[in-house]
Amino acid sequence: MEEEEEIMQKRDFLKASALAAGGVLAAPAIHAQQPVRWRFQTYAGAALGEHVTKPIIDSINRAADGALRIELYYADQLVPTGELFRALQTGTIDAVHSDDDSMASPAEVRMFGGYFPMATRHALDVPVLFRQYGLADIWKTAYEKVGGVTWLSASGQDPCNFNTKKEITSLDDLDGLRLYTFPTAGRFLSRFGVVPVSIPYEDVEVAVQTGELDGMAWSGITEDYTVGWADVTGYFLTNNISGAWIGSFFVNEKRWADLPEHLKAVVLACIESGHFYRNQWYWGGEAKLRAEGTKLKLRSIPAGEWRQVEDAADEFWQEVSETGETANRIVSIFRQYRDVINAAGVPYSFV
């Protein structure tokens, strides 16, 4: 009898031990954290977004290993591009890739995002201006003042050329053209008779076909071919009003604050890697498509005549610099940098 009782006690002990062990093994599954989920919208349509935004999002999702999962939306899919800032600030979306101008940012730096006339000549000017000349600190501070949105990083992309249905060979040819363009760029181009038009990104190609638009002053030739605009316009003007688009990555302030430090590092590293990808994609694309592209005929306005646009940009800079302390500071940096690259000569400047 005593022997049977001892056997029963051993069985009970083993059973209890097994249950306890199972509980320990199951504990991580019970207490595992749910992945952080973000909804991210880019300024770019699907065809362009495949190159300018999606590689970064894919890299973040892989590197985060399930701890952060970002769902990417393209231009106007969740909210119109002009409402991106407010949607981000209120938490309707969690992160954004856009220029300050297009998303109607209330920050003091708004008009300098996108294409500020004649501020840059090459894509690499943008990281130099932000990292070596102080623009990063200005942008960061500007969004801290507004609140609700954290600025993460900026980069350069393609120049702002013209692709149109009719050829442009003089400034007079710009008069009356209805062009899809950025707010500040449109404000500047209106000095030459351009009628700036703002419509949803994905509607632009059809608007050219129906005659609502005469073309675009929105991008370089790489984007024209990538998104289909080269199929509906016949000419590409090699003169540009800016050498590189200034675009940034933004995140809702609270969502960023709540993100663990190691995931913040993942996000920032993947964004920086994406900057490199876009630099080579655009730089190579602009050259190859100008040299070998068959859809758009290249045209140019003579340098002497184009000088009028450069002079008008100087006047525009002065007007903008008088609008506030931050604007004056940024314009001063642009002037300082222009003096440096002009003195350096080719390939930094064109003279």
Positions of PLM-derived features:
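N-terminal secretory/targeting leader peptides
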Residues: 4, 9-126, 135-137, 141-351
